[in-house]
């Protein structure tokens, strides 16, 4: 468990930024990483809120290699961050839920937007830590639209843009 408060994590981030160190809960910055059983028990008995983290065995020097079905072979640094698995309210984080859900739903291929590609190292680490088979990944480019008011490119919005909905094409007779 990690008992760090939001204020402590904020101070940690500020110190990392000031020292030009990769931000996040890792290595020597992960102050709850090596708490003794007695310390953990005392904090829980004192009612101190906590999250559950995965102690990452990753190293910045190591690389993760994977074949993306669209982008081809990709090399990225290993994840070194001790990712939160369960929030203090007991709700799993997106990343942990992604691994568990994909495993139990027998997902073999994950097809998603390229904005998620930076999460692959942490997802591979989570799948392996849980003993799950790592799915194949395919990262698609974002569908962009030129904003009529500004002329800028932006993501197609299912709330703002009617052509993002199937009904738009059905009504148009396509």
What are these regions (language model features)?
Residues 2-159, 163-171:
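Active-site cores that bind ATP or allylic diphosphates and position pyrophosphate for catalysis
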Residues 174:
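Conserved phosphate/anionic-ligand binding catalytic regions in large, soluble enzymes, centered on
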